[in-house]
A protein has these predicted regions:
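C-terminal glycine/acidic-rich active-site capping loop/insertion
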Residues: 48-54, 58-59, 67, 71-72, ...
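Conserved loop-to-helix N-cap of the C-terminal "lid" that shapes the substrate pocket in Rossmann-like
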Residues: 18-22, 172-177
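Short, small/polar residue-rich loop motifs at catalytic or cofactor-binding pockets
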Residues: 64
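Short, mixed charged/polar active-site loops
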Residues: 77-79, 104
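Glycine-rich phosphate/pyrophosphate-binding beta-alpha loops
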Residues: 82-89
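Alpha-helical packing segments of well-folded alpha/beta enzyme cores
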Residues: 25-28, 155, 159, 179
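Short beta-strand segments
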Residues: 40-41, 79-82
Length: 179
């Protein structure tokens, strides 16, 4: 069975991973790393036919993969590969890796790992022997400092407080349109 409803894979039904995901990457980047100045994205349909909810084949007309490069203020470049065709082989369904001069961080939906540049392995390219380095070693799990509630619930609570109590709510129509 498909991992998503069939309309997601049909352009004529407003489907496609580009319209679904790039807006999310926009607010993640804007709010954590810096304002987005530009974006380049190429979409692809890697699976041309799928099976719908009733077991019938249908033609996929929407993009099921997006390869994006974002230019942020401060000279930061961000790259996102979004796919409804890729099988997961990493720590989490979503991982964000940030690399800097003094180290790296990999954040998933729940956990974050860091590696200081002093702990970064220095592999030597030799395809004739098995790789002797376990690249997962040398990473340190960031300790949990507090418990976090469900993010969607927290967002709805902020919105409802805004509607009922007129509290500030920065995620207005203009912010949504940026995506």
């Amino acid at each position: 069975p498909a991992q998503r409803p069939s309309w997601n894979y049909r352009k004529e039904d407003d489907g496609g991973i580009i319209v679904d995901m790039l807006c999310h990457w926009r607010y993640v980047l804007d709010n954590i790393f810096g304002s987005v100045k530009g974006v380049f994205c190429i979409g692809a349909t890697h699976i041309a036919e799928r099976i719908d909810e009733n077991g019938k084949p249908y033609k996929c007309t929407a993009d099921d993969a997006a390869y994006s490069i974002f230019e942020l203020e401060g000279g930061i470049i961000a790259q996102f590969n979004s796919s409804w065709t890729t099988r997961v082989r990493r720590d989490d369904l979503l991982t964000l890796q940030v690399d800097g001069c003094k180290g790296s961080a990999v954040a998933g939906l729940r956990d974050c790992w860091t590696q200081h540049y002093g702990n970064t392995p220095k592999p030597v390219w030799n395809p004739d022997i098995p790789n002797p380095i376990n690249f997962s070693e040398g990473w340190t799990k960031v300790p949990e400092q507090e418990d976090f509630d469900n993010a969607f619930k927290a967002q709805w609570e902020l919105f409802l407080k805004h509607v009922v109590l007129d509290t500030p709510f920065p995620w207005n129509l203009m912010e949504g349109a940026k995506g």
